[in-house]
A protein has these predicted regions:
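Conserved catalytic-loop aspartate of Hanks-type protein kinases
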Residues: 186
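AlphaC helix of the protein kinase catalytic domain
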Residues: 90-102
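Activation segment signature within eukaryotic-like protein kinase domains
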Residues: 110-111
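Catalytic-loop of the protein kinase fold
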Residues: 122-138
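ATP-binding glycine-rich loop module of kinase domains
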Residues: 23-25, 30-48
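Activation-segment/catalytic-loop signature of the eukaryotic protein kinase fold
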Residues: 71
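Conserved short submotifs of the Hanks-type protein kinase catalytic core
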Residues: 75-89
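AlphaC helix of the eukaryotic protein kinase fold
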Residues: 46-59
Length: 250
């Protein structure tokens, strides 16, 4: 049965699908007051992911983070009611090497907003654990929102066996080893995105991006140091460094 047109929760009407991930589909929706919303509907056997995203995202309140409003059910499947984030996923929004084109200002603003969102998350003792282009929605002016918390959890969280969390191209070395992750692990992903913006391509897995003969090189190196004990792990400091090097006022 088509989901579009169905009403879930307290008067939230599903309108159209926005996108699909490996274990969920997201619908654009409108609540009873006419406000745009998103509803993330999980495959039935991924109920634990829905629970994790609810636990991590429900208390977050930052303009650059999508908010998890409540748990709902769609045809018996676990689902979450979210604030609606505008924009396109990062790799769809930007063409090759945006940090070296007329898009530089917008792209660096996207990264600054991402760092602001991560700073709020880290301040609550949480790590995102899947910083990647598909989880960053960017608008035409560069404004950005970080989404998807179904892999998120407490910093330093341990599991019964080594667990590799995240997406390979953006994983920190410690994530590939299955170690507990911290704020510096999220910032490694930001560094990979900065490197992509400067070089126009993702390098070999596990190899930090090389210098780009750009004023942003020192920040790039600090974010992608393979040794997590030396890597920059303070999102607020990284954001201020980025803004200073980029000459951005915000």
């Amino acid at each position: 049965m088509p989901l579009a047109g169905q009403v879930v929760g307290e008067g939230v009407r599903l309108v159209r699908p926005l996108g699909r991930g490996s274990h969920s589909v997201v619908y654009f929706a409108v609540d009873g007051g006419g406000q745009p919303r998103a509803v993330k509907i999980f495959d039935p056997h991924f109920a634990a992911h829905a629970g994790r995203e609810l636990a991590c995202g429900e208390g977050l309140d930052h303009p650059r983070l999508v908010r998890v409003l409540s748990a709902v059910s769609v045809e018996g499947r676990p689902a979450l009611l979210l604030t609606y984030a505008r924009g396109r996923v990062l790799f769809a929004r930007y063409a090759r090497r945006p940090a070296l084109t007329s898009e530089r200002r917008a792209y660096l603003l996207t990264l600054a907003h991402l760092l602001g969102a991560l700073g709020h998350l880290h301040g609550r003792g949480l790590v995102h654990r899947d910083v990647k282009p598909e989880n960053i929605l960017a608008e035409p002016d560069g404004s950005a929102t970080l989404v998807d918390f179904d892999l998120s959890g407490p910093a330093g969280e341990t599991f019964s066996a080594p667990t590799r969390l995240g997406t390979a191209a953006f994983q920190s070395p410690e994530a590939r080893r299955g170690e507990p992750l911290g704020p510096e692990s999220d910032l490694y992903g930001v560094g990979i995105l900065l490197g992509w913006g400067l070089h126009g391509a993702l390098g070999p897995l596990g190899v930090p991006p090389p210098p780009a003969a750009d004023p942003l090189d020192p920040l790039l190196a600090a974010l992608t140091d393979p040794d997590r004990s030396r890597r920059l792990g303070d999102a607020a400091a990284a954001r201020e460094w980025l803004l200073r090097l980029a000459g951005l006022p915000y």
